[in-house]
Amino acid sequence: MAGNSIGQFFRVTTFGESHGIALGCIIDGVPPGIPITEADIQLDLDRRRPGTSRYTTQRREPDQVRILSGIFEGVTTGTSIGLMIENTDQRSQDYSAIKDVFRPGHADYTYEQKYGVRDYRGGGRSSARETAMRVAAGAIAKKYLAQKFGVQVRGYLAQIGDISCDVVDWDQVEQNPFFCPDASKLESLDALMRELKKAGDSIGAKITVVAEHVPVGLGEPVFDRLDADLAHALMSINAVKGVEIGDGFAVVTKRGSENRDEITPQGFQSNHAGGILGGISSGQPVVAHIALKPTSSITVPGQTINRQGEAVEMITRGRHDPCVGIRAVPIAEAMMAIVLMDHLLRQRAQCGDVVSDVPRW
């Protein structure tokens, strides 16, 4: 079955291709009475939108969202919400040279082998352009989470290449095109991007996303653990090759005595687990990290084959990002928000009447 949907109670289905007429999504399970406008959704779409800085693809799409259904007089009605974004700046001619050639590192070869046909224009369905609708759906989830539970979901660029960015100032994240929380690293990041553009090459990145004030109890053991669903959602983002929850792979070198999150009457003393224990949220901040590969759409010549199996030298044309991780921050936020909203609705349905005497912090 086609994997175009995510979620059970809060279910998001997306459709559309990079160079098609439009992108869209259907969102089921949104409770009625939530104030939502196109402007609310547009705020996050503008953060992801291409062509807004010299460090990202120069494809200029307004990404203007249209609400088709499910919202009346500014509030959700409880019925399916339909959203659409028109594609306006396609340059399909840029891809005519790869019609019969498989770009190395891309989905061209695997899509062709799976379906026997592929839309070669900008990667078709495999393009990161599809994530615009995830961000649109995530904006609705973020609004619900904040309004009903005080949950705040936000992300930042944690690393590009060898340049690491610590959280010095959360406010700084929205003040620069890198989503970097450390202003002292901006000059180095700018120099790296210039170097990559000159060389026609690309670089990978690490993004961190944090959800604060998440209620205790979210997650459905054993197969729908909160961390399992988060890993699934984040791993589905284009170019993501790794997901960590909490300290992730760093736990390999730790002792149990230092990794366990000890509890006192005042609360947890650490958060190595990333806010999830036994697949269930602990009430601490939920923390996840994703690693994104360097894009293969570069002008450095590389080896591949054509449809006839003949050796071909490949140079990718078109408009591309030297680091796809830069625009991944709002996408990662959206996927975490979608998963959290789905689990909040599932928790309310099954355990809404449960009252525990155990302290919460």
UniProtKB/Swiss-Prot annotation:
Reduced FMN (FMNH(2)). Its EC number is 4.2.3.5. One of its GO terms (cellular component) is cytosol. Pfam families: Chorismate_synt (PF01264). One of its GO terms (molecular function) is FMN binding. Its cofactor is FMNH2. GO terms for biological process: amino acid biosynthetic process; aromatic amino acid family biosynthetic process; chorismate biosynthetic process. Pathway: Metabolic intermediate biosynthesis; chorismate biosynthesis; chorismate from D-erythrose 4-phosphate and phosphoenolpyruvate: step 7/7. The keyword Isomerase does not apply. SUPFAM superfamilies: Chorismate synthase, AroC. Keywords: Amino-acid biosynthesis, Aromatic amino acid biosynthesis, FAD, Flavoprotein, FMN, Lyase, NADP. It catalyses: 5-O-(1-carboxyvinyl)-3-phosphoshikimate = chorismate + phosphate. NADP(+) binds at residues 48, 54. It comes from the Bacteria. FMN binds at residues 125-127, 238-239, 278, 293-297, 319. Homotetramer. Belongs to the chorismate synthase family. This reaction introduces a second double bond into the aromatic ring system. This is Chorismate synthase. The gene is aroC.
